[in-house]
Amino acid sequence: MASPREENVYMAKLAEQAERYEEMVEFMEKVVAAADGAEELTVEERNLLSVAYKNVIGARRASWRIISSIEQKEESRGNEDHVASIKEYRSKIESELTSICNGILKLLDSKLIGSAATGDSKVFYLKMKGDYHRYLAEFKTGAERKEAAENTLSAYKAAQDIANAELAPTHPIRLGLALNFSVFYYEILNSPDRACNLAKQAFDEAIAELDTLGEESYKDSTLIMQLLRDNLTLWTSDMQDDGTDEIKEAAPKPDNNE
C-alpha cells in the first residue's frame, strides 16, 4: 500500500493533468511536510513542487501585467474613474501574488534549503528563492521593492557560487539560474550590460563543453541555451531601440532529469 507521501505525489500529478494547480501546490506542501527532518525531496518531488508553484504564480503574473497595461492606457486617456477601479483590482492581484510568494519562500527557508545535501539541489532551491523574491520585486514599490531586489540578488549569488563550484557549465540547473539571474539584472536592476555579460558567459561556457553532455540532459540544456541566446538577441537590439518583446525565463518541467 502506498505511503501518505506517495499518495500525495500521485495526487499532485493528477492535479497537474487536470490543470488544478492550486490543489497541486497543496498536495506538494503535504509531501514537504511528510519528509522527515533533514530528509530531501526526490528530484521528481522537487520538480513537481516547482511546476505547481510556477503555474499558480504564473497565472497571477500574467494577470498583473495585463491589468497594469490597461491602467497605463486609461491613465493616458485621463479616465480617472476607470483608473481608480483598476488600481483596486490590481491590488487584489498583488495580495494574491504576495501570499503565494510568501508561501513558497517560507517552505524554502524553513525546510527545503536546509535539507539540501547535493550541489544540484542546493542550487535548485536557492534559485527558486531568488525567483520568488524577484516576482515580489516585479510589483512592489519603494522600500519593499528594494528589499525584494536585495533578497533576490543574495539568493542568486549564493546559488551561482555553488553552481560554479559544483555543476558543469552545461548542467540545466546552472543554465536556468544564469537565465533567470540575467533577467533579474535586465528587468529589475535595469542593468542591460550586466544581463548580457552574464547570459553570454553562461552560453559560451556551455557551448565549449557541449560535447560532454549526456543524452538525458541534452534536450533540457540546449533549450535553455536557446533561451539565453534569444534574450541576448532581444536585449542587444533593445539597447539600440526600445523594444518590448517577451523576455524568456527558465520554466520547470516535471520530466527534468536534473
UniProtKB/Swiss-Prot annotation:
Pfam families: 14-3-3. SUPFAM superfamilies: 14-3-3 protein. Residues 238-258 are annotated as: Disordered. GO terms for cellular component: cytoplasm. GO terms for biological process: protein localization; signal transduction. Residues 245-258 have a biased composition (Basic and acidic residues). Belongs to the 14-3-3 family. This is 14-3-3-like protein 16R. It comes from Solanum tuberosum.
